Design a protein with these regions (language model features):
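Serine-esterase "nucleophile elbow" of acetyl-processing enzymes
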Residues: 100, 137-139, 145-220, 224-232
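Proline-aspartate-enriched helix->loop->beta-strand connector
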Residues: 230-240
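Short, histidine-centered active-site or binding-site loop motifs used for metal coordination
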Residues: 90, 183-186, 242-244
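A generic structural signal for short coil/turn motifs at secondary-structure boundaries
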Residues: 95-97, 188-191, 247-248
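Bacterial Sec-dependent N-terminal signal peptides
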Residues: 1-21
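N-terminal secretory targeting modules
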Residues: 16-178
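A conditional alpha-helix N-cap/helix-loop micro-motif detector
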Residues: 68, 219-222, 249
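A beta-strand-loop signature enriched in Asp, Gly, Thr, and Trp
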Residues: 238-249
């Protein structure tokens, strides 16, 4: 009898967690806005690219490949869910010996607390396809959240998981003029421990502005196609930090 009761006690939580998990509903790009980009989704190969598809045959191959990394991009949404989960799939599953995987291909959750962005948690990657519970046990009023995307890998897909009885909707667009960065690996986010700690993302949070990141590791070389692209933006400020990459081809 004692052995039977112990089994019930041990396995009941597992059953409860399983039931909770099956009630999670995941929502994709139609339920959040994508920040950190000046290019309409219709002009990209993927919503999480940093250059338009038309640039594939215009820029050098390394620049195009690096533009597939989602550095500086974030998704923003409002939900009344008591918990937030995330599923995301990366393009390359990169790893480097000088930068944590959480910075390369992880995701960061922030909460807008009295008009200031407060760090909540980091989704730790394990491979191409990842799933992580970012926060639990919240109250049920609507709150605004932002998730910063990987710095040195691309995103094929990302979905937000919330309770089946909860709602999710797009946050309001930030109508302020953006800040545009063009530069090197430093701009792209190397070697931040997690996406939210790239300096462009820190500036975005502190000023509550959309910041566009055209950092291309080893390839920020003041090239004409990128100059033409950013010159079409009515930006509050342009920050060009290409000097470390200004070498002969």
């Amino acid at each position: 009898m004692i052995k039977y009761l112990l089994s019930v006690i041990l396995f009941t939580p597992a059953v409860l967690f399983s039931q909770i998990d099956t009630e999670t509903v995941y929502y994709g790009k139609d339920y959040f806005i994508i920040e950190g980009t000046i290019i309409p989704v219709s002009e990209k190969e993927s919503p999480y690219d940093r250059l338009p598809a038309s640039y594939k045959d215009i820029v050098r191959e390394p620049v195009w490949d690096l533009s597939k990394s989602s550095a500086g991009l974030a998704i923003r949404f409002v939900t009344d869910s008591p918990y937030i989960k995330v599923k995301w799939e990366v393009l390359n599953n990169f790893s480097m010996n000088h930068m944590p995987d959480t910075g390369i291909k992880g995701v960061d959750l922030y909460y807008k607390n009295n008009n200031e962005w407060q760090y909540i948690n980091t989704g730790r990657p394990k491979g191409f396809k990842n799933q992580y519970t970012l926060i639990e046990n919240m109250s049920n009023e609507f709150k605004e959240f932002k998730i910063f995307l990987p710095l040195y890998d691309g995103v094929k897909n990302i979905e937000i998981g919330i309770g089946s009885s909860s709602s999710i909707e797009k946050a309001k667009n930030n109508d302020k003029q953006p800040i545009v960065f063009y530069g090197t690996s430093i701009t792209q986010g190397g070697c931040a421990s997690r996406p939210g700690m790239a300096h462009t993302n820190i500036i975005s949070r502190k000023l509550d502005l959309d910041v566009v990141n055209f950092g291309f590791s080893g390839n920020g070389r003041m090239e004409q196609p990128i100059a033409e692209l950013i010159s079409n933006v009515d930006a509050k400020l342009y920050i060009i930090e290409c000097l470390p990459n200004m070498i002969s081809p």
